[in-house]
A protein has these predicted regions:
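C-terminal catalytic lobe of FAD-dependent flavoproteins
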Residues: 124-213
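Single conserved hydrophobic/aromatic residue that forms the stacking wall/gate
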Residues: 2-7, 297-307
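Short hydrophobic core segments
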Residues: 27-37
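Flavin (primarily FAD) binding-site architecture
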Residues: 39-49
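A glycine-rich dinucleotide-binding beta-alpha-beta segment and adjacent secondary-structure elements
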Residues: 210-276, 289
């Protein structure tokens, strides 16, 4: 179901309308936990239109990078790589590119790059590892910090920024949800993209060899370039020519925060409890779950729901 409308009387929630398969249902309520994901962009617009306090929030965008799993294992484990008691190796990397942070995010050892679009004319990447973590490649997002100086003024400006680069990636990939990708060596040298080498991209439905500078803002491209170079000095082989980068990773966290009061209510609507990633208070599955649990045990109305 999707959120249709939210109704209030004297700043207290009275009902919500939800939509499913084109049908609308109005549900009376005095308390509602709003636990959307950050991809529910229409919800932000609904809340903005009814006067809720929304604030822009820093986030990060970039690309997915893929290396051979065995290379990352050797770089991290050394002589113990491939030991049966050790799983696929992980890494966590961070550096500065000028006055911005650049870092790895959501590292997926022995995993694949997956499509994560939530609407038309978008290419959005993510990563996942299956239980065995035994795929040929390991991948992670390499992202650069973005804040309100980088996009149009207003609480929803970050959404517009995300949509612009997602649309650029969509068309750079050919307009059929194929993702633009290139070898790291070509990206670092700003050379024309060559055929993929020893590392094969795993994104489905597939990739299109592209110059990623054409679908990323300059400060993001240069930040990624500086970051990969720095990470190559710390993790042997990280900047290998045949590593593959695929655009774009744009959903690291919400660019919007729904303001809450000390009881967890939306500041301009009593009884509406925004929680988790979509509300701007979490940056992943576990932190979103923790935010929901904290709300349940600390806020008056959700506490009553436990009965």
């Amino acid at each position: 179901r999707g959120l249709g409308d939210v109704y209030k009387r004297q700043d207290n929630i009275t009902s919500v309308t939800v939509e499913k398969n084109g049908e609308r249902e109005k549900i009376p309520c005095s308390a509602c936990v709003l636990a959307t994901g950050q991809g529910a962009r229409d919800t932000y617009h609904i809340l903005y239109d009814i006067g809720l306090e929304l604030l822009p929030k820093a986030f990060a965008v970039g690309v997915r990078i893929e290396h051979p799993r065995e290379l990352i294992d050797r770089s991290q484990y050394g002589e113990f790589a491939s030991h049966p008691r050790l799983g696929a190796a992980e890494y966590h990397l961070a550096d500065k590119a000028g006055n911005r942070g650049v870092y790895s995010f959501c590292m997926c050892p022995g995993g694949v790059v997956v499509a994560s679009s939530s609407g038309p004319e978008q290419v959005v990447t993510n990563g996942m590892s299956r239980h065995a973590r035994d795929e040929q490649n390991s991948n992670a997002a390499i992202v650069v910090q973005v804040d309100s100086r980088d996009y149009t003024v207003g609480p929803l400006g970050g959404l517009d920024f995300q949509e612009q680069i997602e649309r650029a990636a969509y068309y750079a990939g050919g307009g059929d949800f194929t993702a633009p990708a290139e070898r790291v060596g070509d990206f670092l040298r700003k050379a024309a993209p060559k055929a993929f080498g020893s590392v094969k991209p795993t994104y489905r439905p597939g990739v299109c060899r592209s110059n990623l500078y054409q679908c990323l803002p300059d400060f993001v491209s240069e930040g990624i370039r500086a970051g990969i170079t720095a990470f190559g000095r710390r993790l042997k082989g990280f900047d290998m020519d045949d590593a593959v980068i695929t655009a774009v990773e744009s959903r690291t966290s919400s660019p919007v925060r729904i303001q809450r009061d000390e009881e967890g209510c939306a500041t301009r609507m009593k009884g509406l409890y925004p929680v988790g990633e979509g509300a701007g208070y979490a940056g992943g599955i576990v932190s979103a779950a923790v935010d929901g649990i904290c709300l349940l045990y600390t806020s008056p109305s959700p506490r009553d729901m436990r009965r």
